[in-house]
Amino acid sequence: YQSQIACKGLVSLAFSQSGQSPDLVAPTRFFSEGGAVTAAFVNKADSPLAKAAQWVFPLHAGTEASVAATKSYIAQLVAGARVVAAWQGDQDLQSALTALPDDLARAAQMDWSVALDVLQGVDRLFVIGRGTGMPVALEAALKFKETCGIQAEAFSSAEVKHGPMALI
């Protein structure tokens, strides 16, 4: 820990709902003091993380009423995707992000209750992802733990036969 890192030329992006976590604030401050360019994507623009970073990008997700912080998580994904789309000049991704509010509104109107039949009585859950879906699987597992109180674990679909399947 606390090893020397060559920070010059480094860009550090930190994503947080509250901007309070010392696990994010300390390295952001360390990188910034070491000459890195630091940016914080936060729901609370006056947070310690925002103060530690050189650039602040408010997420504008609104007040979180739940520990799961789903609005902030979606806002973080969108912010990250917007940065990538602009940086890489990815017109397809930019178009998809422009359409996203309407797509999310349609998804919110759908009847998702059929999932209850699948999940009823479940006390353990595997969430599988791969590639860009792996971080989403990790977050989904966390949401199930936080909101349902069940053992939910995320695994890469590329590795699921080498351990998780042995548990079944």
Model-derived segments and spans:
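Glycine-rich phosphate-binding loops that contact phosphosugars or nucleotide phosphates
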Residues: Y1-D102, R130, M165-I168
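Anionic-ligand anchoring segments at beta-strand to alpha-helix junctions in alpha/beta enzyme folds, i.e.
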Residues: Y1-S12, G34, G121-I168
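Residue-level recognition of alpha-helix initiation/capping sites
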Residues: P22, M110, P135-V136
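Amphipathic coiled-coil/heptad-repeat helices and related helical stalk/stem segments
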Residues: L24, D111-W112, V160-K161
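Residue-level signal for short amphipathic helical patches enriched in basic/charged
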Residues: K44, M110, T147
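Generic structural signal for bulky hydrophobic/aromatic residues embedded
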Residues: V83-A86, A107, T147
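Cofactor-pocket helix-loop regions in the catalytic cores of large enzyme subunits
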Residues: A96-G129
